Amino acid sequence: EPLAGEKANLQGDNQFVFDNNLPSIVIDELAWGSEAILTSTAAAAILIHNDGINILKRGITSKNNFKPGETCLRSIKDMKLISLANTKFYPGRDEFLYFCPNVPSILIVPINTKSFILIGGWSAKCFTKSDEKWINNWSKKINNMFLINNI
């Protein structure tokens, strides 16, 4: 298990914003899953991005419109979870300024080749392997819901 650092004073607003154009069954799943992650892990912020649109922002996030950069795009291209345990040492951390400007750790979890879950942690090295596995499995469920609902 990683040793989490001191909890950061994150910049941003506590938000819960989602795309109203999604079917209610999908909104319900995203609401449930994001709440579960925020309450059962060290996550402070969640964003779900699908095909150029941020379909969910929850937790301490920026009001600015997040656009994925090289790191997020690599995650969905390779279909691999990317863990940035300490963003202070990551040269590409500016990619996440419009997610949560001073977030100390990040998980990028691909859903499919055009969608991903972006999760920011309260402190450096705060996510466990168990957190990663649970969120990765949830991403598979989301992908199935997207397929069933033509999203």
Indicate where each model-derived feature is located:
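Short, hydrophobic-rich beta-strand element in sensory/regulatory alpha-beta domains
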Residues: 34-38, 42-58
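Cytosolic beta-strand hydrophobic patch enriched in CBS
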Residues: 47, 107-110
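Juxtadomain coupling helices with adjacent low-complexity linkers
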Residues: 117-151
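Short hydrophobic/glycine-rich mini-motifs in sensory/regulatory modules
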Residues: 109-119
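Signal-transmission linkers at sensory-effector interfaces
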Residues: 1-21
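Regulatory sensory and allosteric helical modules in signal-transduction proteins
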Residues: 53-107
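Signal-transducing coiled-coil linker helices
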Residues: 20-33
